[in-house]
A protein has these predicted regions:
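Enzymes that bind and transform nitrogen-containing heteroaromatic metabolites
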Residues: 1-228
Length: 228
C-alpha cells in the first residue's frame, strides 16, 4: 500500500480562474460536460475531501449517477460512492442534520484540526472522526492506513491552498468554463502565502491531456512532476 493516497484536485473554474460568481455562494460554474468528468473522477476515488465551508455552501456533496460508472465500482467490489471526508477546524462542527448531505447514500468521515479536543464519539451523521496531523503529508498517511489510496479534492479554495502549501496535490483536473466573472473567489486565494516555490517552476506540472466538453468547456489534466 502506498505511503499516502494520490490526491487529485478537481474544480470547475472560469477563464479568469474564479470558482464562483462575485457574490459568492455555491460554486456552480460547470455544465453537463464538467459533471461527466467530475463523476469519472469520483468513480476513480476511494474518498473525496471537502472543506466545511464548501459543505455549508452546498449542503450536499456530488454523487456518481452514471450507471456505467456505478456498475464498474460494483464489479470491483467497491462502495457505490466514495467516502465524503469533511475537513473542519472543529471536532464538533454544527451541521444541521436536515441537510441533504446527511441523507445521501455514502459514508461520512470528519477530519478535524489537531488542536481540537477529540470527541468521545463521532458527531451525529459521521461514522468516523479523525484528528489531522501537523501537515497534510501526515494526514494523508493516516488516511492511507484507513485504506484510502485515491482521493479527490473538491475544495474550497482554502482547503486547496493548504494542500498545495504542503505540496500534497498530485494531479490537477480543471474544467475551464467559457465565462469571465471577476471578483475575489479565485481557486487559489489571492492571499495564499507560503506556497512552495517549486510549484511555480515551468516544469512543475506535466500535461496529461486536454479534452473539449459540451458547451465549449475544456478539461485539462496535469500531473505533479516528482522531484529527482
Amino acid at each position: 500500500m502506498p505511503l499516502r493516497p494520490t490526491v487529485r484536485l478537481v474544480l470547475a473554474v472560469s477563464l479568469d480562474g474564479r470558482l464562483a460568481f462575485p457574490g459568492g455562494g455555491p460554486a456552480q460554474l460547470g455544465g453537463a460536460g464538467d459533471r461527466q468528468v467530475l463523476e469519472q473522477a469520483l468513480a476513480w476515488a476511494d474518498g473525496c475531501l471537502m472543506g466545511a465551508g464548501t459543505l455549508r455552501a452546498h449542503h450536499c456533496t456530488c454523487l456518481i449517477r452514471e450507471s456505467g460508472l456505478l456498475e464498474e465500482r460494483a464489479k470491483a467490489q467497491r462502495s457505490p460512492q466514495p467516502t465524503a471526508c469533511v475537513v473542519s477546524r472543529s471536532a464538533t462542527p454544527t451541521f444541521p442534520e436536515e441537510w441533504p448531505f446527511f441523507q445521501q447514500p455514502l459514508e461520512r468521515w470528519l477530519l478535524h484540526g489537531e488542536e481540537a479536543a477529540a470527541p468521545s464519539a463521532a458527531p451525529a451523521g459521521f461514522s468516523q472522526c479523525l484528528a489531522m496531523g501537523t501537515t497534510w503529508q501526515e494526514t494523508l498517511a493516516q488516511l492511507a492506513a484507513q485504506g484510502m489510496q485515491r482521493l479527490v479534492l473538491l475544495g474550497g479554495a482554502s482547503l486547496a491552498a493548504s494542500c498545495l502549501r504542503d505540496d500534497a496535490v498530485d494531479d490537477l483536473q480543471l474544467t475551464l468554463t467559457p465565462r469571465v466573472v471577476g471578483g475575489e473567489h479565485s481557486w487559489v486565494p489571492f492571499d495564499a502565502a507560503g506556497l512552495p516555490p517549486a510549484l511555480a517552476s515551468s516544469d512543475a506540472w506535466i500535461l496529461q491531456g486536454a479534452e473539449r466538453l459540451q458547451d465549449d468547456e475544456l478539461v485539462v489534466r496535469y500531473q505533479r512532476r516528482l522531484p529527482p
